[in-house]
Structure formats: structure tokens, C-alpha cells
């Protein structure tokens, strides 16, 4: 990663649009976007948090609330998360000015959170409609005093490495499509009011053949591994990668998506650092009785996993060999 930004690069970065679509001149091109710290934190610090803020973040169960800017309408996007969740992750693993990458940006919540926190961010999505949604939300949340860049790109996640220098990304954060979890009719068994607008509907991201949300678990896991293996070199050493996933029930069996992803990303070179529980009990309404009295099943809608990985640091022996080669 470069130690400084040239004047020409700074001018170029300020001219970047908030959205890039297939066919645009910048599509498939390396983005000249700033990725360096703009804070005065010590070089060894991993974030700008105070000691008090750090202590609060050590608790391994997190709760969040939605705010007015959040999108909760599933007809707009089938799987959203609060801005406050994205802000927590970004604050914990980046400094001001650094670069955040969301490989499956969806409704653009990551971009809004990064903008609030003076971080640069780029999000990718297959669907032009979601990129348009991101752009609209960014324009509604514009801040004339914020000099960071937020960009949504219509692109397959498999092609993301074309857009960045190696080692330029400080955080990869996303809530990806959840295999074929949403690609089936809703039965609302866990809802007290089952006969609502969601009953019988398929709340899917798309039916694009490249969409991870239509894949069976084994194929989904391998495809996620292929994508994240290509993303790993974009992270600087000790740069974090956080993935929000639930598990699912299918034909009376728990499908442990989070376990599959942990094992797959470990095989691809990532190191698991933490597992955090997102406690959703404060934002879930109308839960009905489920499984009583013969089959105890935890309510999947009440919690999800935040899987925290990082790019392992380069061993000192390798650094010494590299220094000797350069001399």
C-alpha cells in the first residue's frame, strides 16, 4: 500500500461518481480512491476508539436499533441490517480515512455508515436496481463537510480485485446472500400473525444465475470461498473481514451456514478471530410458538452471527528474507 497520495490521485478520487454501472467508463477499472488514515492515532492502534468505547465492544453479544434512515421494507430489499450495526463494525476495525469494502452491498447500508464515520467505502452488487438505490440513499445523506468517497458498483463479486491495489483495504464487511434460504415460499411458522403480506412469498435478491442466493449450501460455500480467496490480497496484513450470517432450518434440520463459512474461509487463508452474536430480540416482533410441545427449536430470527476474520500478519522470518532480497 502506498504511503502517500499524489496530487493527481487526490484530484481523480474527488471526481469519482457515487455509482458505476455496467458500460460506464470506470466499470472494470482500478478506482483511484483514498485508503490512508486521516486521523492522528498511533500507528499500532487498530481503530480510533477510546478505552471506554473499547471495553463496551468486548462484550460478545450485541444489540442494535433501527433508525429513520434504515430500510426495513422487504419489497425494497429482502435482507437488511441497521446502520448502527455497520457503524459498530466499521468503528471497531478501521480508522478515519481508511477504505471499507462491501462485496454484496444491497441497499447500501455499509456506504451510509462509512459516510457517517468519515471512512471511504466501495460496495458491489449484481443488480443495477440496488446500485441505483445506494446512489439515492447517498444523495439523501450527503454531507458537504465530509471529504470521503462512497461508491456503489454494478459488478459480480468475483471481479472485485480489478478495482483495487493489493493491501489497500482495511475492512471487508458484508451481509451476503444466504444460500437459498430466501429462495422458497414463506410459511411464517414462527410468526404469531402468520397471514401477513409475507406469507407464501419468495423474498429473493434476484434469479440471476450468478446470484449466490439461489445456490444450494455446498455450492454456495465453495463460491463464497472462491470470492473471498480473491479478496484476501486486497486486505492489508491484520486487516479484518466480518461476515453477518444466520443459520437456517430445512426439513427439520439445522443448516449451519456459519460453520460452513468458517471452515471454508480458513481453507482459503483467513484466520478466525472472533464470533459475535447479534441479539435481535429487541427488533423482532410478533413471535409465535414454534415446535411445542414435541420439538424444541430456537428461533433463528432472534439471533445471527458476526464472523470476524483477519488476514494473518506476515511472519517476521519472511519479512527478514524480503528485506535481504531488496538489499
Report the location of each language-model feature:
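Class I S-adenosyl-L-methionine-dependent methyltransferase catalytic core
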Residues: 1-327
